[in-house]
Amino acid sequence: MKHIDKIISHLVNNPEAFDQFKNGNLTLLNINEKEKKAILYAFEQGEVPRTSKWPPIEAISNFFEDDKRKSLI
């Protein structure tokens, strides 16, 4: 999950990177399609604020504890 935490943190702080992420190559990020869907779901549901004031890494990992979200990864 550490790599997902880092990706989310990077996307939150770089709006241009988010657009590239939605349309880009996943192999460079070391994630699979399901992980990409889970991250996009987080943004679409408003769970990830588009600001640099994101909570600690633990909060990001906790996001994926929800059953519906777990099913995405």
Curated annotation (Swiss-Prot):
InterPro entries: Competence_ComX_Bacillus (IPR009233). The keyword Nucleus does not apply. Signal peptide: none annotated. It comes from the Bacteria. A lipid is attached at W54 (3'-farnesyl-2',N2-cyclotryptophan). GO terms for molecular function: pheromone activity. GO terms for cellular component: extracellular region. Trp-54 is modified by farnesylation, which is essential for activity. Modified by the tryptophan prenyltransferase ComQ before export to the extracellular environment. One of its GO terms (biological process) is establishment of competence for transformation. It is found in: Secreted. The keyword Secreted applies. Residues 1-52, 59-73 form a propeptide. Its main location: secreted. Keywords: Competence, Lipoprotein, Pheromone, Prenylation, Secreted. Part of a major quorum-sensing system that regulates the development of genetic competence. Acts through the activation of the two-component regulatory system ComP/ComA composed of a sensor histidine kinase, ComP, and a response regulator, ComA. Activates the expression of the genes for biosynthesis of poly-gamma-glutamic acid (gamma-PGA), which is involved in biofilm formation in B.subtilis natto. Interacts directly with the sensor histidine kinase ComP and stimulates its activity. This is ComX pheromone. The gene is comX.
